[in-house]
């Protein structure tokens, strides 16, 4: 029996809401049809490049499942809430947001890490000129030059928000007093804000901030993907989480998703030209080709070798939590991390 599928991904990009899908009338289900599972995520960016590649290449179907990826906004909290409420089986979320939810009692498990650091900071052209610091100056000079500026990033408390705070502290700035940080829950507001001169700089996942470059509003100031900040290149900024009971009751589906993500990760690493072209066409077509290629090429080392959420990355994030590592004294890395996703 032939099954026609309906898969709809709602995407909120920097230019508005776009619905992408393959639609058709559904036939009655049969036992050989792939199981449809929902994954919630923030708006498409290279933070979720591996899940996007899984959808683009349909590696999920190769492992007996069909993933309905619903992606919008900038807050991982919404995705976590959907997982906890049973509205989604999987959440593709920011690492710190996931860990904070677990610390607060959310019965979640980390089954995969899908990206390292893809945060980019773009500074307004006129601000860069006024500072008198070159965008190729030593990173310490570029970070310290942010003193007194207004910088917008992801929602307050989000992974992007905390990455930025850690950069500032690393180079001697107080993120609460030396820089005016603004958390934004709507990704398109980052680009429009820098265009309208409300922000001096914006920091978020590539390639969303590159829209500001494409529109002539700014230039790259700090690049996580190219390793500008020492020690931040392997910190696992994006995770896949599930409820603990999902592992107990649906381990086969968890394993199927991990296998599909592994295939997608291999494509990201070894088939970069073809994968980049496909992602550009499906999710980032409104980004001019040259700008997209620059953003994609910069992520060569931004994706991990495997899906492990390392103990090293865990230690990094709990140390950079605003409440400190001590607030995780009742959290056990080995318990919250799926056994096959653990590594030093």
What are these regions (language model features)?
Residues 19-22:
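C-terminal motif of bacterial Sec signal peptides marking the signal peptidase cleavage site
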Residues 30-174, 182, 200, 204-206, ...:
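Short, glycine-/small- and polar/acidic-enriched structural segments
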Residues 62, 129-136, 143, 226-233, ...:
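Short, solvent-exposed loop/beta-turn-alpha elements that line the ligand-binding surface or hinge
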Residues 318-344:
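Conserved C-terminal helix/tail region of periplasmic/extracytoplasmic solute-binding proteins
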């Amino acid at each position: 029996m032939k099954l026609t599928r309906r898969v709809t991904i709602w995407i909120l990009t920097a230019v508005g809401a776009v619905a992408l899908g393959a639609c058709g009338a559904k036939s009655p289900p049969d036992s050989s049809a792939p199981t449809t599972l929902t994954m919630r995520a923030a708006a498409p960016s290279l933070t979720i490049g591996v899940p996007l590649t899984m959808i683009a290449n349909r590696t999920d179907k190769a492992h007996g499942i069909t993933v309905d990826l619903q992606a919008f906004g900038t807050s991982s909290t919404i995705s976590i809430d959907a997982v906890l409420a049973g509205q989604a089986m999987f959440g593709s979320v920011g690492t710190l947001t996931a860990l904070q939810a677990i610390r607060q009692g959310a019965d979640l498990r980390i089954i995969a890490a899908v990206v390292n650091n893809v945060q980019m900071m773009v500074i307004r052209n006129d601000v860069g000129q006024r500072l008198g610091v070159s965008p190729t100056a030593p990173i310490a000079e570029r970070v310290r030059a942010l003193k007194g500026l207004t910088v917008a990033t992801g929602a307050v408390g989000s992974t992007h928000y905390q990455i930025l705070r850690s950069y500032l502290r690393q180079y001697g700035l107080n993120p609460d007093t030396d820089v005016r940080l603004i958390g934004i829950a709507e990704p398109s507001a980052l680009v429009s804000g820098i265009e309208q001169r409300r922000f001096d700089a914006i920091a978020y996942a590539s390639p969303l901030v590159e829209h500001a470059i494409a529109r002539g509003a700014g230039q790259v100031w700090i690049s996580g993907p190219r390793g500008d900040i020492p020690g931040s290149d392997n910190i696992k900024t994006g995770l896949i989480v599930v409820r603990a009971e999902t592992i107990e009751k649906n381990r086969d589906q968890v394993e199927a998703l991990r296998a599909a993500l592994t295939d997608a990760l291999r494509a990201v690493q070894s088939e970069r030209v073809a994968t980049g072209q496909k992602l550009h066409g499906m999710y980032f077509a409104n980004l001019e080709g040259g700008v997209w290629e620059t953003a994609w090429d910069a992520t060569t080392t931004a994706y991990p070798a495997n899906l492990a959420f390392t103990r090293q990355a865990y230690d990094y994030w709990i140390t950079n939590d605003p409440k400190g590592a001590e607030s995780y004294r009742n959290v056990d890395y080995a318990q919250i991390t799926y056994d096959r996703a653990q590594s030093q």
